[in-house]
A protein has these predicted regions:
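Active-site substrate-binding loop specific to GH73 endo-beta-N-acetylglucosaminidase modules
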Residues: 8, 12-445, 449-487
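Post-BTB helical module
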Residues: 1-9
Length: 487
């Protein structure tokens, strides 16, 4: 029971659980069913999948604007440190006084012009505001003091030079008429809700796995479903805080900030966990995304050839097509075509799906080496990639992800990541890897070569026969003699 509790709950049994099993020769099937259906098991299930995903976003700024609490024994106020100079003319906080000077539209006007105290002394001084009381979205029913300029609730800013309106949003727009919006909704709060947003982004892919598994759906649906899971913090992030979010999640539901997790339908181009922000940002390049999928969920890691790489002077080492380059082809003949499935998703930190994309750019095809724009060099094949004269001639102007690809491989651009894992050969490989990953986790060791060719094959067949029901697979493994013999 101790080992089973550690694997299914992530903790040792309680005294009550030990007493319940006292006198029994073995843990009954009914008790195992009870454990697998418990909330503690699902907590452990999410932790398990987060470990497979290497869930970690570092301490990157996930949003455009943040507010922070500034306090000492005399003054306690929230403000946006990024815009202090923009609001007041110097890098200073607001004054400790209630702000009472507003125009007819309710916009704060300066309480003191040409303020000359402290860091504002000299020159034109500072344009100073006081504080206002605000109910922050992350703590409804409470009030905090926020510098008046920072707390501006208006959604319209200074008109652009051509007269077009400017909208205040999470970017702040470098506009002194833009604050954090109604109830500070365009700013995240360090020390208050930043950690909740960060944790929710890491948790989202694991929640997709949980929803698929709890519903008894085939495990593979986690890589293809349009649905995702959101709680209040995550829904607010997608609606109001995400600085680069064009993946149609600005239409996330308007949930209470403390709302629990629930399913939300995304656009048709989404592919389960493979197009969540947490996955795409954690693995920011298409090659990294392919590598994690193959390593963690297909149990097929990419490894350098045993003979090492050929000399850099070898003609074959100069091939700009990695899928054919000596020493690279053994991995990249698989990696490069697979990256095309993510070709409409931007690389880097942005969460952007490119609905409109030019697969060929004439300007990029015809620019001379050393004279191509950054845009061309970033997205298209240009002469900058030329390793020998004429080596890129047939591919010039093509989108990088489509270079040296066959017509069938190019079609993957429209199909997306879900089409990659839906291939019959990968469905079988996903199933086998799911069984192997879980078995090695609970056995505390790698499967032997003999087990992989016999026992794993049998367990995978059972998994497939049960419709890829992950819970049935878990029960099958933990009731197996191999697991029961673990000391």
């Amino acid at each position: 029971p101790r080992q089973l509790s550690l694997e299914l709950y992530g903790r040792i049994p309680t005294v009550e659980e030990y007493e319940r099993l006292h006198g029994l020769e073995d843990v009954s099937e009914a008790i195992i069913d009870e454990m697998i259906g418990s909330s503690e098991f699902y907590d452990q299930l999410r932790r398990y999948h987060r470990s497979l995903l290497w869930s970690n976003l570092g301490d990157n700024d996930l949003v455009g604007q943040t507010v922070e609490r500034s306090r000492d024994e005399n003054f306690d106020v929230w403000l946006n440190r990024q815009k202090r100079d923009e609001y007041r003319g110097r890098d200073v906080d607001c004054l400790d006084m209630e702000h009472t000077n507003f125009d007819a539209d309710g916009r704060p006007l300066a309480m003191i012009e040409n303020y000359q105290e402290g860091d504002c002394a000299g020159g034109e001084g500072c344009t100073m505001d006081g504080w206002v009381q605000v109910q922050p979205y992350w703590a409804p029913g409470t009030t905090i003091r926020v510098c008046a300029f920072d707390a501006q609730p208006h959604t319209d800013g200074t008109p652009r030079d051509n007269g077009d309106p400017r909208t205040c949003d999470q970017s702040g727009n470098d506009d002194p008429l833009c604050g954090c919006g109604p109830n500070l909704r365009y700013c995240t709060a360090r020390g208050a809700n930043y950690d909740a947003v960060h944790e929710a982004l890491l948790e989202e892919p694991a929640r997709i796995f949980e929803e698929v598994i709890a519903a008894g759906e085939p495990y593979m649906n986690a890589f293809a479903t349009r649905a995702t899971a959101m709680n209040g913090a995550l829904a607010h992030f997608y609606r109001y805080l995400s600085d680069d979010n064009d993946a149609e999640l600005k239409n996330a539901p308007e949930l209470a900030y403390d709302a629990d997790w629930q399913l939300v339908e995304r656009e048709s181009y989404h592919s389960g966990i493979l197009t969540t922000l947490g996955f795409l940002r954690r693995f920011a390049s298409h090659r990294a995304r392919v590598n994690r999928l193959y390593t963690a969920f297909l149990c097929d890691p990419f490894e350098a050839p045993s003979g090492g790489l050929p000399p850099a002077t070898d003609d074959c080492s100069l091939n700009p097509d990695l899928s054919a380059r000596c020493g690279c082809a053994s991995c990249h003949e698989t990696i490069e075509p697979a990256t095309t499935h993510w070709g409409r998703w931007e690389e880097g930190d942005d969460f952007v799906y490119l609905e409109s994309i030019d697969t060929f750019n004439n300007n990029c095809a015809n620019c001379e080496k050393g004279q191509c724009s950054n845009y061309c060099k970033t997205f298209y094949i240009t002469r900058e990639l030329e390793t020998t004269p004429g080596s890129v001639d047939t591919e010039l102007g093509k989108l990088k992800t489509l270079g040296w690809r066959t017509e069938e491989e190019v079609a993957a651009l429209e199909a997306g990541p879900s089409a990659l894992v839906s291939r019959p050969e990968y469905q079988q490989q996903l199933a086998s890897c799911a069984v192997r990953n879980f078995s090695e986790r609970v056995f505390g060791r790698e499967l032997t070569a003999e087990e992989r060719t016999s026992w794993l094959v049998d367990k995978t067949a059972s998994f497939e026969a049960n419709g890829h029901d992950f819970l049935a697979m878990v029960k099958d493994v933990v009731t197996d003699d191999r697991y029961r013999r673990i000391e």
